[in-house]
Amino acid sequence: MIKTTKMLAAILVCSTTPVLADGHSQIWSMAGLANAPSSSKMMEGMTGSILINSSIDLWDWSEAPEGFPTLVTAECNQSIALTAEGAPFGGVGVCSMMDPDGDLAIYFGEITPQLEYIGSLTAGSGKYEPYVGQKFVGTVTGMLKTGQQMYHVVAAD
């Protein structure tokens, strides 16, 4: 159970991209596949641990508007704080991606004790630049024993 909880928290990083709809900035829903971590490190202390993971995630942007790619990959890195018993109680994650047009986006977020990922677009170029600061919430919808997961992301506002 502790291993599953650690993996769930560690791979929860997810993202989405903002768009214009009806004159207002909005974020479309997306699905993501977090691969098993390509690297993993545990820093163990007296009262808890920090799990540091990296993975390459696949993002399904099939609901994206015209001009945005419908499928992208992102490099994601997470640091998850765990109690001495192995339960997550917070963390951070960063996902960086460059789309086929060469536009880039960096997403940052906090991983909550409820295993949600609350984040925003922190930096972006090209079509992403006008939407820096857009917020989203991600939740895991399924996980395999290998650490691979499906997650879903929606607008936070």
How would you describe each model-predicted region?
Residues 2-10:
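Sec-dependent signal peptide recognition
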Residues 16-18:
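N-terminal signal peptide c-region/cleavage motif recognized by signal peptidases
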Residues 22-157:
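Beta-strand-enriched cores of mature, soluble protein domains
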